[in-house]
Every structure is written in C-alpha cells, then in structure tokens.
C-alpha cells in the first residue's frame, strides 16, 4: 500500500523514463514530484497522464519567480492541469499572485524558503544577509504564510521550528533533503531520514535518487514508507 506522505521525485530525463519508473513503482507510490529538468522533456504531459490515467497526485516543482502579473498568469494556466501542489519562491508578492492564479482550483501553493542544497556559505556567496539559517527560514516562512501560502518547502532541519509558528497552523510543510539511512546525501546539505522528517513536523517528504537509482525502486519506496512513524 502507498502512503501519500511520500512524494517520489521523477528526476529522470524524459516522459518515457518517467512513465517506465511510475510503472515499476505501481501502487507503491501515489504522489509524484515533477521538476524543471523533466518539464523540458515533456513534464506537463507526464503530469497530465499520471493524474488523469493513473489517478496519481502531482507536485509540480517550478519555483516560479517573476513579476506578479506573470506569476498569476502562469499559475492560472498550470492550475488547469488539476495539480495538487505547485511551488513558487516565498516572496510575498509572488505568493499573493500565485494564489490569485490558483483561485477556483484545488492546487495548493507552496512557498520555497531556502533550498535544501544551500548552507550559510552559499547564502554568503549569494549576498543574502547575515543570520542563522533557522532565523532566515522562519522569517521567510512567516511572510509566505501571511501572504496566503498553503504551505512551505523547507529542509527537515527547520520543520519543527516552522510547525511551531502561529501562522503555520493548518498549513503544509513539505521537506526535500530526505535520505533513508545509509543513502548518499548527493547534492543535499540539510538532510534527515524519512522517520525523523515526519516526526519533526513534515506533512510530506520528497525522495528521489534513493528510490529511482535503486535496483528495485518499488522495494526502495516500500522501505521508505515502512520507516514512517
């Protein structure tokens, strides 16, 4: 049986490989993330097929960031695909525009706080102001919630802190950077196990390579689900 707290990242090059992986996973997975890499290889068509023909839930990870009118128009168009989750950057004007675009649909707008592939050194390189990572994430999450975000994307390390924010009541926390015990961290820097991420307050976890690079992806997904509290 699947558990929709697990979202599998379809970080493969094209639709053919994406469908092949989804077929291998079968009913062990009910929720998929499609990111920018897949979008250039027919990702919207894949999202539509998985949603309409296979009954899967879809998280489109686009991290939209533009002027308000452009974000609103883009989200309005994407919402026609009956997406479950859609990501935008957490700037308040972006979140508000995305919510306007998603109005009338069931698409949840999730705001990115700070990418799980970044640490304080990376933020310094990007000229992002000084401060502890936890404080910066809390500030961005709070502003996104105030702007109307249905949830946020954060590393597992910040999930407990975000869950404690008054503004977070009834909102979603989705955590990439989740690695089963013994898995390589890859390009993620702020990571946790599936069990720890959920215990710390995440509603959903995103797992990619530890599943789709496994010799038996279905078994790998089932092991992740078995580890959830």
UniProtKB/Swiss-Prot annotation:
The keyword Lyase applies. GO terms for cellular component: cytosol. Signal peptide: none annotated. It is an enzyme of class 4 (lyase). Pathway: Pyrimidine metabolism; UMP biosynthesis via de novo pathway; UMP from orotate: step 2/2. Coiled coil: none annotated. It comes from the Bacteria. Gene3D superfamilies: Aldolase class I. The active site is at 63 (proton donor). GO terms for biological process: 'de novo' pyrimidine nucleobase biosynthetic process; 'de novo' UMP biosynthetic process. Keywords: Decarboxylase, Lyase, Pyrimidine biosynthesis. Its EC number is 4.1.1.23. Belongs to the OMP decarboxylase family. Type 1 subfamily. Homodimer. This is Orotidine 5'-phosphate decarboxylase. It comes from Jannaschia sp. (strain CCS1).
